[in-house]
Amino acid sequence: MSRHDKPATNVEATAGQGRHPPAVPRHSNPAVPRYSYYALAVLSLVNFLNYIDRQVLPAVANSMLNDPALKLTDADIGYMEASLLLSFTVLAPLFGRLGDRHPRAKLMASAAVIWSFATALTGLADRFSFMPSLNLHLPVINITLAISGVALALCAVRACVGVGESAYSTITPSLIADFFPPHRRATALGVFQAAIPMGFALGFVIGGVLAHFFGWRVAFMLVGVPGLLTAVLVWRLREPARGATETEAHASSLEEVAAAPAEAPRSPDSSGANESTLRTVWRILSTRDWLVSTAGYTALTAALGAFATWAIVVLVRDKGMDETSANITLGVITLLAGATGTFGGGWLADRVAARRHNAYFLVCAVSTLAGIVPTLGVLVADDARIYLPCTFLAVTLLFTSNAPFHAILLESVPVRVRAMAVALNIVIIHACGDAISRATVGVLSDSLKQGQFAALASFARAIGIDAGRQHLTTALLLAPAALAVSTTLFFVGARLQKRPRRAIEG
């Protein structure tokens, strides 16, 4: 399908074909069977554990930086985070294609086993200090990127964590879309996405507390265990037919899913399965709503990722909090504010969508714009009575985009390529977003400490940041700049979205 072709609606696609029923209008609101809610609960639980595992590294980063046996720099922590995200993104298209062709529950359960085992192994990675160190000089900006053998080993293990998380995050949204009809989809995705701030929050708390009492190595080993156990629940999930909630016949057949066997692999000649991967990728990239929303979310992800990695270190090093208090405080804030923003964003978007066809873009744009001021407040203020409330407000507003963005992502592409659409989105938002921002902030922090980037340091001083002492906070000024870019792109998407949203068969 080229960008100039008008996608067929459900009604057009089935007209004249007696064996296919007409599409269900959105206002018919078919009932959602109980099994769909059970499946959502299982998938959300594992996603919750996924983000606990991911967030343990930022939670214990300060302990690792202060461990004399490791001798890590800020840049090393950034490289570890980037390595996870790069493996996450490189493999996303592969898992997206597999998810469009094979039973998804089995793939996702296998993914949970991989990332959980790799998380536990991270606690032993510093034993592989025999790995060589690497140095790369960038003459254009006069920076040398250096990484020790220990840091390289840690990067390798974190990359394995990214392999498992890539498969799970890529495939799961398409399965949820087949469990829930359009009028409940954004809310369901909001529940699933709410596991992200909740996992982030508990990752801070659990990682920080375990590191305080047992050390950072034990923290990694223990948090990997629950994912291995819950993978069994995902393996046993029964799948609905693809596109099950898009037509009346499929909506009724969804009620039988609890008693049905898991979906069998589709034959090569089934709809969309014989389309080449390159044609599928082009089909998705030429979809305007998908492209603009992904660009906006990439900038938002860059800002969120930078804070997710460096927030604890900033609170301890630049704000003066102790590490355990910082982890617990940020964990509670992220849990309450993140869940509020994610649930609220899905709820708000579904209701505004009844009146405005571009509601999802507007909710993303307005919430991101509103989040810029409290984000700056977190960086500039040194008084906890100011920067902690600003943190709560910023997290709430920035997570509001989660559910409406994913609804745009899924509704803008054909049903048969949803997993690939999510995979491509993952590639872009991480490879061009937080994989870069997390590492860049670490490199900038080390460079500012050495007296480089005088212009950035001068700007930081002008707005009240002590750039000489708070070099990590200064480096994090990249975050509000990224939010401004994100806001602009979401408003562009709202302006360009002329026709009503609809599910696309394919």
For the regions a language model picked out, list residue spans one by one:
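Central cavity-lining transmembrane alpha-helices of secondary-active solute carriers
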Residues: E81-R97, V332-G345
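Symmetry-related core transmembrane helices of the 12-TM Major Facilitator Superfamily/SLC fold
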Residues: V218-W235, T474-V492
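Helix-loop-helix hairpin linking two adjacent transmembrane segments in secondary transporters
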Residues: F192-R242
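C-terminal ends and interior cores of transmembrane alpha-helices
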Residues: V113-I147, T368-D382
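Extracytoplasmic gate region of multi-pass secondary transporters
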Residues: L57-P58, T287-F343, L398-N402, H406, ...
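Cytoplasmic helix-loop-helix junction between adjacent transmembrane helices
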Residues: C155-M198
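Primarily marks hydrophobic transmembrane alpha-helices of the MFS/SLC 12-helix fold
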Residues: M108, L154, N358-C364
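Juxtamembrane intracellular "pre-TM" segments in multi-pass secondary transporters
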Residues: N29-V32, E246-T294, D318
